[in-house]
């Protein structure tokens, strides 16, 4: 019975991969908060991000929430990654084991773009002011082994992005499953067989930047005399979707 369930689950996953890839390919280049695509943890990145089926530590908060159920003792992870052009990325997370309930995880990802010169059409070399930009994601995860060979996990996250005086925010959820099978197991035990992992990340609301930087005086009639140059105007920004990520992996 268990083998039938596992085989059926594998077939469903393969079908979903084909379907979701077809649905999300047209969103490339049209998303915001792309720092959510940067991997967490040296072990995962050294494996080329092929981690969804073997995630079993605090970094599972990012890769596959279901993997957090394999944490046996409360633990923490701190990571600092120097990125491109003086961009710094930091992750801090912890996993807390609650007997007979599951594992709870908390994680914070912060990306700092540093400071830059403020420029405009009149002062293209800089106005003398400086501005900064940063992205933050706070994640709450719950994971549990439903049975000995099947784990499920979900995350709720709050995403915030700030550029000088303008900011945007969104909410999202992550879902993940991890299945231990006895396929290709030389001992017949599930733990020695093939693992199947799947996760969907960043399914949530859209982000739209707003702030005092979007409010500027506009001259509605620059070729006519009169006090038209102090009319309050607002630059309306568009809404952008979060980068929806679908991962599936197999490990032996």
Residue ranges and their predicted role:
Residues 59-70:
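N-terminal periplasmic accessory domains that precede
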Residues 56, 72, 87-88, 136:
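Short, basic and Ser/Thr-rich N-terminal targeting/leader segments
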Residues 1-25:
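Bacterial Sec-dependent N-terminal signal peptides
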Residues 49-52, 74-83:
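Short strand-turn segments of transmembrane beta-barrel domains in outer membranes
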Residues 23-45, 81, 88-252:
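Outer-membrane beta-barrel porins/channels
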Residues 52, 68, 83-84, 183:
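Short polar/acidic secondary-structure junctions
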Residues 53-56, 128-130:
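Short, flexible loop segments at the rims of nucleotide/cofactor-binding pockets, characterized by
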């Amino acid at each position: 019975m268990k083998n039938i369930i596992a085989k059926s689950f594998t077939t469903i996953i393969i079908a979903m991969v084909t379907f979701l890839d077809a649905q999300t390919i047209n969103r490339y280049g049209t998303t915001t908060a792309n720092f959510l695509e940067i991997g967490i943890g040296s072990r995962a990145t050294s494996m080329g991000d092929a981690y969804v089926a073997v995630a079993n530590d605090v970094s599972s908060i990012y890769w596959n929430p279901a993997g957090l159920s394999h944490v046996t003792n409360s633990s923490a992870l701190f990571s600092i990654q120097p990125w491109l052009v003086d961009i710094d990325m930091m992750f801090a997370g912890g996993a807390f084991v609650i007997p007979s309930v599951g594992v709870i995880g908390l994680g914070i990802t912060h990306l700092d773009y540093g400071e830059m010169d403020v420029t405009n059409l009149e002062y293209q070399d800089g106005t003398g002011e400086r501005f900064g930009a940063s992205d933050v994601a706070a994640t709450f995860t719950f994971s549990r082994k439903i049975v000995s060979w099947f784990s499920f996990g979900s995350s709720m996250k709050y995403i915030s992005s700030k550029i000088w005086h303008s900011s945007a925010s969104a909410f999202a959820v992550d879902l993940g499953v991890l299945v231990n099978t006895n396929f290709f197991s030389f001992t017949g035990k599930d733990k020695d067989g093939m693992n199947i992992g799947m996760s969907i990340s960043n399914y949530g609301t859209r982000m739209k930047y707003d702030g005092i930087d979007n409010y500027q005086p506009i001259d509605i009639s620059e070729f006519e005399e009169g006090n038209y140059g102090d009319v309050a105007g607002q630059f309306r920004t568009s809404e952008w979707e979060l980068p929806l990520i679908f991962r599936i992996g197999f490990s032996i």
